[in-house]
Amino acid sequence: MVRPYTRKDYIRKIPASKIVQYDMGNLSGEFPLEVTLAVKEHTHLSHNSLEAARIAANRYLQRTTGKLGYRLKIRTYPHHIVRENPMATGAGADRVQSGMRGAFGKAVSSEALVRANQKIITAYVQVKDFEKAKVALNRAAMKLPVTCKLVIDKGHDLVQF
């Protein structure tokens, strides 16, 4: 795993994170069941993929359980700043660019560095909506560039998994 590049004091222009919300649904409700999406291996998750996973899970849960029937929480934050040294291609590119001289690059994106078995997204639902939460988190897992697993954090005695 790489060392995170997070010192924002040294970076002039930081790209904004596309993740709009970290807590969605009924924030004040009590839910007996917590189903969590966890990654199986070390990886980098871009803010774009985290936002796509959030949208997929939130939209499905909102459609199937209603606006007050769930709570969804994003549990990682993209702190790591990704830099890129843009290389010119085509005719005459060697005159325009300086190659690897001054190759530190510009900040282009942000990523979350996640470890194996780290929890990414948690859905809080009623027992009757357990299958819907599983489908929603599986849809979110399809948007991530890593294999994921479902973990029941709370209420595992209430459902068969």
From Swiss-Prot:
One of its GO terms (biological process) is translation. One of its GO terms (cellular component) is ribosome. One of its GO terms (molecular function) is structural constituent of ribosome. Pfam families: Ribosomal_L16. Keywords: Ribonucleoprotein, Ribosomal protein. Belongs to the universal ribosomal protein uL16 family. This is Large ribosomal subunit protein uL16. It comes from Methanosphaera stadtmanae (strain ATCC 43021 / DSM 3091 / JCM 11832 / MCB-3).
